[in-house]
């Protein structure tokens, strides 16, 4: 038997789940070939739910992430068909949980599409990225909403929130890094805050421009406590313009202040708080107490990520402007354009159908009129013949 025939028989045995036949064929040198769609024996075993056959093939060294001609892996097959046990054994053997097919859909997308809740939970457990978007800009959560599956939607929503909380680099989370240079533009020119603050001690320093900076030490409380402490500490700074500028250091106690480095800068008629701590997230910031603040405070993030203004008599709430990623915005625009084009085409098609119906109706009216004229002529002939017959009888 040729190698080609052995390869074909191996595919058939894997499809049928014949473990012994698979072992015999591999022992006889059957190659791991694919069919015309690029489907390997492992694809077939995973697709048709043959757990033991899948294990035999994996132990024999069949590629766990083999791709078909549409880039589907065995994990895609098993997840799409809802074979949770096969999904798990593939993942345990190191299958790529976030592999994408030609539609940029992962196993999680396919499991959600076919409402396989057990498989969805298993994929999330093994680290599937719930934020991944398909070619149609759909996450697994979007698909569950489209399918009306509330249970899956809830599971995926919780998973999305958990991944955001454990991933500080999530696009919806504001994170500030200490490596970003800090500059304040004041009446005296541009001031580099990095040079104003010592790297070790909590201190207050002043430069020649009259801009003062306060740096606080480390702690483990929330950013809200940080800004509250900074607000209280800023009260004496509001009168800094009335006192002579000195180059001495003044230690400030801030045990409740969070983060590695916090800076308060007073310049002109306002105070600027710049948070330069590495890894601080402002997701839990709601309001800042304003007692003791005599002038506005501006909290500035690096690169202009966020600006929070606290008037002296108001309580400011965090405002986070979250823009869609450029790729998603482009996808949304493409979808909107497609919808608009589809509506225009539909209107044009309806108008064509209406025009065609009007033409048909006009044609039928003309035919009816012609028939009526023929009927009238025939009736007149009958009347003439009747009169003629009557006259003959009278004679």
UniProtKB/Swiss-Prot annotation:
Post-translational modification: Acetylated by EP300/p300. Deacetylated by SIRT7, promoting heterotetramerization and activity.
Stated consequence of mutating residue 31 to A: In a colorectal cancer sample; somatic mutation
InterPro entries: Ankyrin-SOCS_Box (IPR050663), Ankyrin_rpt (IPR002110), Ankyrin_rpt-contain_sf (IPR036770)
Gene Ontology biological-process entries: mitochondrion organization; positive regulation of transcription by RNA polymerase II
Subunit structure, interactors included: Heterotetramer of two alpha and two beta subunits. Interacts with HCFC1, causing repression of transcriptional activity.
PANTHER family, per the entry: ANKYRIN REPEAT PROTEIN, GA-BINDING PROTEIN SUBUNIT BETA-1
Name of the molecule in the record: GA-binding protein subunit beta-1
Gene coding for it: GABPB1
